[in-house]
Amino acid sequence: MKSKRQTLVILSPGFPKDKADTACLPPQQIFVKALKEICPGLNIIVLAFQYPFFAAEYDWHGIKVISIGGNGRGRIYRLVTWIKAWLILKRLLKERRLIGLLSFWFGECAFVGSRFAKKHHLAHYSWLLGQDARKRNKYFKWIKPKGDELIALSDFVAREVQKNYGVKPLQVIPVGIDISLFKTTSAKRDIDILGAGALIPLKQYDLFIEAIAYLKEDFPNINAVICGKGPEMQSLKLLARAKGVEDNITFKGEVQHKEVLKLMQRSKVFLHPSGYEGFGAVISEALYSGAQVVSFCKPMDKEYRHHFVVKTQGEMNARLLSLLKNRKLDHDPVLICSIEQIAKNMISLFVD
């Protein structure tokens, strides 16, 4: 006999293929695990549309994952993926007691999820996580959502959605961090500047390299580290060589999440040069690691200690120089929000 426990289905473009796949969407991984921990009696099922690149059903930390294996293919293949997702949801509706659907990002998952939920009178929320709030997101035209169906990752994302689409998300639920992942350490802060993220044009790591070149004039032995992979890797390495800082910057490539956190705890400053960011989980993680944070993005209206928001490259360089010259930098952890509280806020939308 099939379980009739309350079931929440999470729809996501991707999800880790196994427990070792910690580099795949770390904030979403942490969130789903937290949901399981605070609601042990709740049955959670994750339906992954595109990644992993294979079709399977498997267990991930006690959570059932159903991978469709869409593999990012477009046109007719994407339609086939949507049909498969719909059929899986129909099966789950028959077998389980669904309390609702939660879609990560306002994209194809939200499209399928919203239509299915309306047809079967289920609660459905779309969690806008950043890029989906920008202009020219076709899914807003297709879905025509109401504000009470939308959850914004940050105050910034909520404003972007209202500005670009004339609808204001009624809920703002930001990134949370799992403080248990941060080990007590007395490690020396031997990394001057750390960066972590996808090496794509939007993240602007060319500005990171130019900042290191600027700082090298005052700190010839400056030690910088960049974690992440992407199509910009080779061009960034060439830029570092051209700027004379190839010996000052270590390109780590893709690094497991727990190792990134360890590097943060060894860093004096975390530099996040991204030109657009819904929130940036790395900002929360770096702050809790005790690093000073410099970024162009300001996700929440509230001010947080150790987070310096700059508007120009010149202002960024000046702030970095000031921080590195300060021999009495405060490296106390700053907590924006715990993942437990975020999970409680989310599940309260589905259950009383």
Cite the ranges covered by each PLM segment.
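N-terminal subdomain of nucleotide-sugar transferases
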Residues: 1-53, 351
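Conserved donor-binding/catalytic core segment of Leloir-type glycosyltransferases
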Residues: 9-11, 186-203, 207-212, 225
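Short alpha-helical donor nucleotide-sugar binding micro-motif in glycosyltransferases
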Residues: 254-255, 262-267
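Nucleotide-activated donor-binding/catalytic signature segment of Leloir-type glycosyltransferases, i.e.
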Residues: 237-255
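Aromatic "clamp/platform" in nucleotide-sugar-dependent glycosyltransferases that forms part
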Residues: 275
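Carbohydrate-associated surface elements
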Residues: 156, 176
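A charged, aromatic-enriched C-terminal amphipathic alpha-helix characteristic of glycosyltransferases
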Residues: 325-352
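A conserved, positively charged/aromatic
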Residues: 124-151
